[in-house]
């Protein structure tokens, strides 16, 4: 794991600030990747490869980056917004990082190894019926069989999963990349599809700030920002942390997410002095034994769901976050669709 993590870190740094030697070596592979990705999409759009349509509208929320765009809070915000408008929403996802390959409809006993950390987090935050599976269509069928009153499905991270037809496509794009001219496809860059793909989606949500003035891939552009909530105790979520009591304590922050620096910065922006930070690979397994010794250990919500059976120590705290999307993305989605049934 350490060597793999180190190599992945080097590649991610290259994606942010390209190294000439690596670019020379990886550029031909990116060209090959581009041809394969383009052919695959063309085959589905032309009907050469079959795609499946579910009996309810499907809204895909994805990205053309290989993760790290802040998509999960945006999916949660969209689902919550649709629920507030009376729509019975379901969520489907691949369930990346889970140990089982079978389709799984989440329930109160579901764990991260059954569902994946992000789907489990979405399920717990929104209360929306959720199913995971490598085939999104199969996951959707299972979800509708278990919850036939669902009127709309949000497909998390399914932009490139063309085997499932979609009624609305939403792409999340990081604000930090809107002014860049050196973006490239995998493996030389972090893109799964070229920037031109943004021209064909229904909406683009720029995450983490304002877009560059020249970035206008879609006439329907939204912006999202992350707001930190009140830190709560992992063992007792109703107990809120008084951050003032941390003044003379040793605080360690642990994050197993794609962009851990954002999490660490959020804590510092709250006035918390972090003695040490621990960055783990995205979706990494984590247990109580992996947590460092400190007066207070603060973790992400995404990591918190991995402790499904609780934890024996009382010094672990969780920082919740939510995405604020402007203008109203849920209203936009409903305008694009017709006759979405409302919950009774």
UniProtKB/Swiss-Prot annotation:
InterPro entries: LpxK (IPR003758), P-loop_NTPase (IPR027417)
Binding site for ATP: 65-72
Molecular function terms, GO-annotated: ATP binding; tetraacyldisaccharide 4'-kinase activity
Catalytically driven reaction(s): a lipid A disaccharide + ATP = a lipid IVA + ADP + H(+)
GO biological process, one term: lipopolysaccharide core region biosynthetic process
GO cellular-component term (any): plasma membrane
Enzyme nomenclature, EC number: 2.7.1.130
Top-rank taxon, per record: Bacteria
SUPFAM superfamilies referenced in this protein's UniProt entry, alphabetically: P-loop containing nucleoside triphosphate hydrolases
Pathway: Glycolipid biosynthesis; lipid IV(A) biosynthesis; lipid IV(A) from (3R)-3-hydroxytetradecanoyl-[acyl-carrier-protein] and UDP-N-acetyl-alpha-D-glucosamine: step 6/6
Keywords annotated in UniProt: ATP-binding, Kinase, Lipid A biosynthesis, Lipid biosynthesis, Lipid metabolism, Nucleotide-binding, Transferase
NCBIfam families: lpxK
Family of the protein in this entry: Belongs to the LpxK family.
PANTHER family registered for this protein in UniProt: TETRAACYLDISACCHARIDE 4'-KINASE (PTHR42724), TETRAACYLDISACCHARIDE 4'-KINASE, MITOCHONDRIAL-RELATED (PTHR42724:SF1)
Reported function: Transfers the gamma-phosphate of ATP to the 4'-position of a tetraacyldisaccharide 1-phosphate intermediate (termed DS-1-P) to form tetraacyldisaccharide 1,4'-bis-phosphate (lipid IVA).
Protein name stated in the entry: Tetraacyldisaccharide 4'-kinase
Provenance organism: Neisseria meningitidis serogroup B (strain ATCC BAA-335 / MC58)
């Amino acid at each position: 794991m350490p060597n793999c993590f180190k190599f992945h870190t080097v590649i991610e740094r290259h994606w942010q600030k390209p190294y000439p030697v690596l670019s020379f070596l990886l550029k031909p592979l990116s060209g090959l990747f581009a041809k394969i990705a383009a052919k695959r999409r063309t085959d589905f759009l032309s009907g050469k490869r079959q795609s499946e349509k579910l009996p309810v509208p499907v809204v895909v929320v994805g990205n053309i980056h290989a993760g790290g765009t802040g998509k999960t809070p945006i999916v949660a915000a969209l689902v919550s917004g649709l629920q507030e408008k009376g729509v019975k929403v379901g969520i489907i996802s691949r369930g990346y990082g889970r140990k089982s390959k079978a389709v799984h409809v989440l329930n109160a006993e579901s764990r991260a190894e059954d569902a994946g950390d992000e789907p489990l987090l979405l399920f717990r935050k929104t209360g929306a019926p959720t199913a995971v599976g490598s085939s999104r269509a199969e996951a959707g069928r299972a979800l509708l069989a278990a919850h036939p009153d669902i009127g709309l499905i949000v497909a998390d991270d399914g932009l490139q999963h063309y085997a499932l037809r979609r009624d609305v496509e939403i792409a999340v794009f990081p604000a930090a990349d809107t002014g860049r001219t050196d973006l490239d496809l995998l493996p030389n860059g972090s893109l799964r599809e070229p920037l031109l793909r943004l021209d064909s989606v229904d909406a683009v949500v720029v995450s983490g700030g304002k877009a560059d003035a020249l970035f206008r891939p879609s006439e329907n552009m939204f912006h999202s920002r992350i707001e930190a909530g009140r830190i709560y105790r992992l063992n007792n979520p109703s107990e809120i942390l008084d951050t003032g009591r941390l003044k003379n304590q040793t605080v360690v922050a642990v994050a197993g997410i794609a962009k851990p620096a954002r999490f660490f910065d959020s804590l510092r922006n709250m006035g918390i002095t972090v003695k040490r930070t621990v960055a783990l690979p995205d979706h990494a397994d984590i247990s109580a034994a992996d947590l460092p010794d400190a007066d207070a250990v603060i973790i992400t919500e995404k990591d918190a769901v991995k402790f499904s059976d609780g934890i024996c120590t009382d010094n672990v705290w969780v920082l919740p976050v939510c995405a604020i999307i402007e203008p109203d993305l849920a209203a936009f989605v409903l305008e694009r669709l017709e006759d979405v049934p409302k919950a009774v």
